[in-house]
């Protein structure tokens, strides 16, 4: 995988995807225009730095995005265009392998699967008699998850230590411009790699709840557990809470 993602061809494909996304608002960033003006050199130098082990990601850019609720914002930490190309090349290379080990009850950030499928799954469970529902979510999931938990799940299926080391390098907490402190945990919301890794952190919980016979669905950090009887949900809540706690996380009450 590492040879493929670090090749000029792999990076060129990733660049095209980053370029399209950057152009959606009709105005390319200055950094994007500069790269496009000397693309061949950019790709060659980036490929060489990855293969020689000299590549280092730049500080993130903080962006505060207003939420629908007045006065509240969502904080994004956005990589540079150069780092986005590397992240996209990684995702393009490993996404299929990662998807193979995910539970069918995990519905977020997956190609060909989405919220409508989650709703259909829950409706089917209801019709099958799973009419008692526990709905919860993980408290501050993205800022508090441990990237190493995702890499532990990912490493055996990727089978390439250099790829795992690169993911660790670009996904580990690092400083954002204008911020004095570096995060000790969590993953940057604004990185295309974040959703994939976030899905994998709770992969064990997904499989455990499903294997225990509960009706189950997860969409990112939102979780629904269904059971035929209300009392069953107490045991389900205890099991889910212990699995989440094993990752240093908590369920919202």
Predicted regions located by residue number:
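Conserved two-metal-ion catalytic palm core of "right-hand" nucleic acid polymerases
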Residues: 1-163, 171-177
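Conserved polymerase palm-domain catalytic core
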Residues: 50, 63, 104, 120-253
């Amino acid at each position: 995988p590492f040879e493929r993602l670090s090749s000029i061809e792999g990076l060129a494909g990733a660049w095209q995807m980053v370029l399209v996304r950057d152009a959606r608002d009709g105005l390319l960033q200055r950094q994007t225009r500069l790269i496009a003006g000397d693309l061949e050199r950019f790709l060659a130098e980036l490929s060489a730095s990855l293969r020689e082990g000299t590549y280092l990601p730049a500080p993130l850019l903080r962006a505060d995005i207003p939420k629908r609720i007045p006065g509240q914002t969502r904080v994004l930490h956005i990589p540079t265009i150069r780092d986005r190309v590397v992240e996209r090349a990684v995702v393009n290379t490993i996404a299929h392998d990662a998807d193979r080990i995910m539970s069918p009850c995990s519905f977020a950030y997956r190609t060909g699967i989405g919220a409508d499928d989650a709703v259909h799954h829950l409706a089917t469970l209801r019709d099958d008699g799973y009419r008692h529902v526990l709905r919860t979510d993980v408290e501050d999931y993205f800022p508090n998850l441990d990237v190493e938990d995702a890499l532990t799940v990912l490493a055996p299926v990727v089978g390439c230590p250099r790829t795992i080391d690169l993911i660790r390098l670009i996904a580990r907490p690092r400083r954002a411009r204008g911020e004095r402190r570096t995060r000790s945990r969590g993953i940057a919301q604004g990185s295309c790699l974040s959703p994939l890794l976030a899905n994998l952190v709770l992969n064990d919980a997904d499989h455990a709840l499903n294997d225990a016979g509960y009706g189950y669905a997860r969409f990112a950090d939102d979780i629904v557990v269904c059971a035929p009887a209300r009392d069953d949900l107490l045991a389900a809540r205890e099991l889910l809470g212990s699995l989440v706690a094993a990752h240093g996380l908590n369920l919202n009450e």
